[in-house]
Amino acid sequence: KNKISKNWVNKQRRDTYVRQSKVDGYRARSAYKLKEIDEKFKIFKGGMSVVDIGAAPGSWSQYVAKVVKSGKIISIDLKEMENIENTLQIQGDFTLVDTQDRIKEYLKKKPDVVMSDMAVNTTGIKNIDSIQTGELCKEAMVFSKDVISEKGFFISKIFMGSTFNEIVALGKKIFKEVKV
């Protein structure tokens, strides 16, 4: 193994959230970022309908499934995922109209939350990664505008980079309120 991968493994072993995710049964540490957002803004409630775009490996969907319990969760990703109780999983490319139509087909009502943790496979060139991931975020926002309930929430991860302000500005055009 090269030095970079050894450093990554060592960092993972020391990471508190990585260790805690194993204890709590989450597939990734990102569940705690969503939990932090939820605790701050009080988003998720029992019975909600949620769409999770870019869901693999599934930690955001796992967190939401625990909170919304009897709600409906649709998880979408290019990658195959292990099943998560109380979720409908769609394996497909979210950027394709066919996949977006399949999501809309499964929705019986407008979702309360659309969340996106989509990111491109990183190149290691931060500006390029930021731009490409920003494009995915914008696509998820535009989709959300058409499907989300009137009092619904859109949650997304975006990289700080050259397109950050542009993405926030688009969010302000689409949604009543934007919090970063």
Question: Where are each of the predicted segments found?
Answer:
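Glycine-centered, small-residue-biased loops immediately flanking beta-strands
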Residues: 48, 71, 152
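C-terminal substrate-binding/active-site "lid" region of AdoMet-derived donor-dependent transferases
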Residues: 51, 84-87, 114, 125-180
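Conserved SAM-binding loop of SAM-dependent methyltransferases across substrates and taxa
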Residues: 57-69
